[in-house]
């Protein structure tokens, strides 16, 4: 909410929604509300979001900072019926993307693709690996 009022409304820069960071600074909004507000700032450009999970939860070690990124992404990413690209932030990089596909996208040509060029396909829901 602060980014929308303080940045987007003043200078028009689109907001990149970050699922993990939203857990720590909700602005009084649900995940879906914050996501859709961020998506509304992109105009005619396909929106981009960031997705990561907590290393503390992954390792089940309370000594690890909750903000630290996990090696892999385990939960299915909720898009709430919207169309946007997702950048996966995970320590295992391409292996994290591969494992996500194996867990959630099996036998579905709408998986996560790695690299700068998008493959030609019907779906526009393509997730990118962050470099």
Regions flagged by a language model, labelled:
Residues 52-131:
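C-terminal accessory extensions appended to soluble enzyme cores
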Residues 1-47:
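Acidic/histidine-rich catalytic cores of soluble enzymes
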């Amino acid at each position: 909410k602060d980014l929308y009022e303080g940045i987007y409304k003043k200078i028009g820069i689109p907001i990149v929604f970050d699922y993990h960071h939203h857990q720590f600074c909700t602005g009084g909004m649900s995940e879906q509300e914050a996501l859709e507000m961020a998506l509304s700032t992109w105009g005619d450009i396909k929106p981009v979001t960031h997705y990561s999970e907590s290393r503390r939860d992954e390792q089940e070690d309370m000594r690890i900072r909750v903000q630290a990124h996990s090696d892999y992404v385990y939960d299915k990413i909720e898009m709430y019926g919207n169309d946007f690209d997702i950048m996966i932030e995970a320590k295992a990089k391409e292996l994290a993307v591969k494992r996500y596909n194996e867990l959630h996208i099996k036998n579905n040509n709408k998986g996560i693709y790695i690299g700068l060029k998008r493959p030609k396909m019907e779906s526009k829901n393509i997730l990118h690996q962050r470099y």
